[in-house]
Amino acid sequence: MDKQETLYENGICAEELKNRLDNNENIILFDIRSKDEYESGHIPKSSFAVCNSQTQEQIMPKLPKDSLIVLINDDDQHSSKMVSFMKSAGLDAVYLKDGISSWKWELEKTQDEDITAENLKSKLDAKQNLFLMDVREPEEYSEWHITESINIPLSQVGKPDSLRKIPQNSEIVTICARGNRSKVAKFVLAGHGIHAESLEGGMKSWTVAFESAEKTYSINGKKITVVQVRRIGKGCMSYVISSQGKAMVVDPVFPYDEYVKIAKKNNWKITRVYDTHQHADHVSAAKSLAEKSGSILHLSAYEDYNFSHEPTYDSQEHKIGDMTLKVIHTPGHTNGSLSFLIEDELLLSGDTLFVDGVGRPDLRDEAEEFAPVLYDTIHKKLLTLSEHTRVFPAHGNTNQKDQLSSKMEDLIGKIPFLKMSKEDFVRQILSTVMPTPSNHKVIIDINKNGNISNGTEANLLEIGPNRCSIAGK
């Protein structure tokens, strides 16, 4: 077959394509021109697509084989070559002969946009009219998903029953693990005349995206600014706390540049970096951040670390600006867990006490030993603090502009664990079976040895939900 015959074999004329679209045939239109050209005018139901090696590796294998795929471009030879490649992968593909110039009917002018994790969280907080379609397989979805989403696997997205589930007048967001299947779902929906956005980077990006909330407290005549930095998807919370231009950072995660940016924006100098304990659910960035900022690295003296740091003991007091931090050894979640009390009013409780529950004692496989210790820590060290003490935990979720914290007196009223006898507390804790965080033993080893400084590698290990707390029942 010569080159001209191949072109003819791989092409479809505009009239035939129009007829098929009018008959609502199962067609996916990929406009592979530049984004500017696409947005200046494109065939209705078409999607902007990039044809490159990454697309061929990550997107093409997931395209439905029961749909006709039509490529739209102004270069017939390039389009024919791409169609031949797609056919070799088992896809039913053609290109529009003579490109967009052959289309005699009305064009649409819309922008091709996807949505970032930060923007999606902002819209969820504002309770905008969203329809979140998670296109992963059911077992992936059940493991971890955005609460407001529903599961429609990619193989079912274009089916009539699935299409009927999509409400009208909603902003539709497709979601998958890394943003590849969700792109395909977006293309399939476009073929049915339904506009959707794909979550950029999928649940991976949802895991690592940041948001922060800042509040200044006046305590004993001192101004103390607390910036709560939150991982949107995982719920990890860390803190940048400043006084008189000096700042401390507690429980930093990768990428640690976020804390550097916060300090720079406020003209603060980071002087101390802390971890409340040896984390099991995320890779600590404390060592890397301390090295980057030239700060003192404070780690629990009751846990083993195989790198240089300042061992931090119970009852020590540290000065940051004109505020005083008091160290409290609070074992139970881990044997070496620490909490930090600032000016006797603000408590950074790590994974020991949350606003809706308590830390889990089983991540070192010593739950029977640690559970009664956790009870004693809570009742003899934390609940003896002033009832007006404001608790800032290391995990939780809240609206974008709010800080998640609670006064001790309020926690006592709403967390049943805090009102139980020791016997009932231990029995309830030990009877609560929960899955462990992803790769938790690998993460513990990394945090013990400090043998990672690559945020990308760290984030790959951490994908998944918060599993360090036991909610009150």
Label every PLM stretch briefly.
Residues 1-27, 35-131, 137-171, 177-239, ...:
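Rhodanese-like catalytic fold shared by cysteine-dependent sulfurtransferases
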Residues 2-3, 187-188, 192, 211-216, ...:
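Accessory terminal helices/loops
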Residues 14, 117-118, 225-229, 238-242, ...:
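Core dinuclear metal-dependent hydrolase active-site scaffold
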Residues 31-33, 135-136, 177, 393-397, ...:
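Short, well-ordered beta-to-alpha junction loops that form the rim of enzyme active sites
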Residues 73, 176, 249-252, 271-279, ...:
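Active-site neighborhood of phospho(di)ester-bond hydrolases with catalytic His/Asp-centered motifs
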Residues 140, 181, 256-257, 278-284, ...:
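Active-site environment of divalent metal-dependent phosphoester hydrolases
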Residues 187, 234-235, 247, 254-328:
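Active-site HxH/HxHxD metal-binding segment of metal-dependent hydrolases
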Residues 216-266, 340-350, 356:
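Conserved beta-strand hairpin/beta-sheet module of binuclear metal-dependent hydrolase folds
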